Each structure stands twice: as C-alpha cells, then as structure tokens.
Amino acid sequence: MSGGFYLVISDEFLAMVGRDYSADVARINLELNLKGDGLLVDYVPPHTFVGNIDKMENGNCILVIGINPFLWDDQRFERANIELPNHCLTNYRNSGDVNALSDWINWQKEYFLSNEINATHFKKISRLIGPRYFSLTHGDDNWRDTLCQHIVEVDIVPYYSIKAQINDHKLAKLYRHDSALITHLNLIKWVIKKIQPRWIQVNGKAGWETICQELLNGEGKIIDDAGDKGSEIMVGHTNVSGNRIPVLLHKFIGGLGGANSHIQRNQVMDSWDKWLSNNS
C-alpha cells in the first residue's frame, strides 16, 4: 500500500494508472483486431473501479465485472473521465504525492451518486439484483441507493470504446501474456480481496472465457435450466481472496442475445439461486 490513502490507493492501483495507456491501447487494438466503433480509444485514462470500496460491508456487496467501459459523447463524460483524471495524473507524476489522485478516486467512489453515471446501464444492474437480494435498500425503486451500498464495478478491459466488440477467445489468450491486462487483473484481485463480495457477477458473454481461465481455474459450469440461450449462465468459485467466493456469469443485460426480457432476467437469477443453494 502507498501514501495516506492506505485503504484506497493500493500499489495495484498505482501500477495500473502509471502505465502508458496510449501504448497499451494501440497494442491491444492490434492484438484483438478491433476496428470501427469497437476500437479502444487512447485518450481516456483506464477505468479502474467505481463504487465506494471503503464503505462496502464484507459479504453484503457484489462485485460486478463488465466487458469494457462505454465511450460517451458528452461534456459531463469529458470532465469526469478525461479532464479530471488527466489533471490528477499530471500532478501525481510531477509531485510523486499520491494525494494528488484524491479528487479522481473520490469521484470514482461517489460515481453512483454523480451526474456522470451511465444511468441507463446501471439501472438495469440495480433492478436485476436489488429487489431480490437487497430489498430493504432497494424498496420501491431506490436503484441508486442499492448501487451505492452494495455494488462495486470493474471492467475486464479497462479502456473505452463506442461499442463492445471484443472476441472472448482472443481476449482470454491475450490475458495470458499482455502486461497491461495482467496489471489490471492484479487490480481486480485487489478489489476482490478488499471488499470480500457475497459473489462476483460478470455481465457479458465476451468475458466468460477470460474469467473462467483467470478466476475459476478453468472450472466454470454452464447451466441452461430454462432452455433459453438468453438466460444461460456459467457458474463457479474463485479463491483469489483467500475465501471461496461464488461467481455468476451471464450474458449482457440489454444486449443482443442477452437476458433482455423480465422473464429471461428472472430465469438467470432463478438458475443462480438454485445453484447457489447447493454450492454456497
């Protein structure tokens, strides 16, 4: 750990944000053969995490892992995701003082309360999880409260694009040797150890092979209780935190071929509950 932010700014975080992310993006775009709207952009600093990792209650929160962050053409996005982190990173590199990163990290921790939140996306996550597992917090539709109190989010690829067009198999192969992705995985593992989530939930089929390889030791099990490919899931456990943590992988909520209807989303969570009751 480093500096005055003992619980927040880990060596893993500093290693990730200290990289030449423009060079990393150029290399990963080439390796994954990304083009058009799927290209990762080289001018936005990497997405590390959002959610208040200092206030999460161990065993009463969920780590959501997405595919890669959405590039939003909006002044709010530019202020929060480009101008703020670049200002903080410049000051940190010039001074060597980790306190220079505090405004950026504090914004990340308060992301779910901010005007810059990708509300369309995160409402779906909150409404998928909240009513069933955090009903006292979620109430009628307190989606922000559910996120703030119970969710931390990271992405398997920390770089932004207009569309997620990442090939699952190519990504898993790249994760075996790419220095930026290995550094990012170390950060994800640090987040898992810190918040000790009730479970880890992967949102998007493009992350299944990589997560199975890197967190499940290649032992993920596919379940299709409903006979509906949209609600098919993969399940398993990870031991990276020193504890045995369940992992749910489902297709992208709201995406092509994913669990898009309320029926399919309930099928996803019903299958998860059934498996979890016998494998917790």
List where the protein language model places each region.
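Surface-exposed cleft-lining segments at the edges of enzyme active sites
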Residues: 101-121, 125, 158-182
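C-terminal capping/extension of enzyme domains
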Residues: 1-38, 172-189, 206-280
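Active-site and ligand/interface coordination hotspots across diverse enzymes
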Residues: 1-121, 184-191, 237, 278-280
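A contiguous catalytic/ligand-binding core that recognizes phosphate-bearing ligands
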Residues: 130, 134-147
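Structural motif
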Residues: 64, 201, 247-249
